Amino acid sequence: MTTLSLVRDGDWQTLLSYLPSEYARLAVEHKQLQTQYGNAKITTAESLLRFILLHAGANLPLLQTVTLIAEAGGPRLSAMRLHMKMRRAAPYLQALVERMTPWRAEARAEQWAGYSMVLIDATTVCGPGATGTDARVHTKLRVADMAIVEAEVTDAHGGETFKRFLFQPGELAIGDRCYCNAGNIAHVVECGADALVRFNGYSLPPLQLAHGGSLDALAASRGLREEGVLDLPVTFEHGDERLRGRFIATRLPRADAEEARKRVRKEHGAQVSPALLESAGFVMLLTTVPRERMTASKCLLAYRLRWQIELQFKRWKSLCGFHRLPNYRDDTIVAWLYAKLLLGVLLDRMSVDRSELSPPVQLEAIPPQARKRRRRRSAAPSEPAVEGHEHPVPDDRGGPAATLSA
């Protein structure tokens, strides 16, 4: 999606066709078109979105954005007025994203042991010159078709929790160790779904074994050999209720375990404990999935799918420029991020419906002589294409597994 695409009328109308049908009504509902004076330049939701998506999608300064649209024959707006519009636009853009994310919810997802697998994670973004996190983008991603089911933008204080999302019966929520606490798991179970998370003994109440006594996760895992799997039924408390689950563990291959210990040493420095270093050599999971529905080995394989959401965040930051926050204001940052999310969902839709955007050439409609000339031209030597550079894009050598420690 180029800068020209967002300015040119033909491309712009194509983009609008992918938006929810009620995008204009939502703009009125969220008071985006209210004005104090009669000479307002932006009077339609279409004009408002054109300014916002050009500003965020092309990473243009405010002044350059309004200048480009004015030169293309659009409304003449001051940079300060666009800034004020951005400050108020976050709720409207959020409503658009919420209506666009479940667009493939009716599709029959590929199921694994009867589950629809959903990945939950968040990525951080920083502003210019920042020394810490300025905002977080929280996402629920369905594995079967890599569709964004839900997304939410918060400031730096918005924690990672399953409670930000609603889950459906038949879903399996997969998250890393920061989601491993009793409240998060209880929320998923209350929705009628199941959870599969990386075990974090520091954030959980003591796990009780079926025969009595508390589980010592490291001691129980210590006797495992490579490729061995431990599967123990456990219970734990959340308020007045007791939840049932399974503790699953396996030992990492020696090379992967050493890499995991290097990461732990780098993160904790001299304060790293021997127990933490030893536990880095294992993958430990906690799940509410019944044993008769999914074996421990299958749960370990399912957790390895979590790396897909990390790749999605990298794609967003690469293609949509998520890592380039425009300024320091919380309100405009949230609006800017929702605009980026909206563009990401639009790209997702367009990639699925690409045949409608670029219909294939019907060879039967081309005269035979023209077909011969076309073949001769394609056989002639020509300048290398843009993609034909000296350094080919490297393969993803991490492979689909990316190790169990991912």
Functional labels for PLM-detected ranges:
Residues 1-59, 67, 76-77, 81, ...:
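Single, function-defining residue in the core of a domain
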Residues 64-71:
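Short alpha-helical "recognition helix" segments of helix-turn-helix
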Residues 72, 88-92, 322:
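A short structural micro-motif
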Residues 83-105:
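Short, basic alpha-helical nucleic acid-contact segments in DNA-binding proteins
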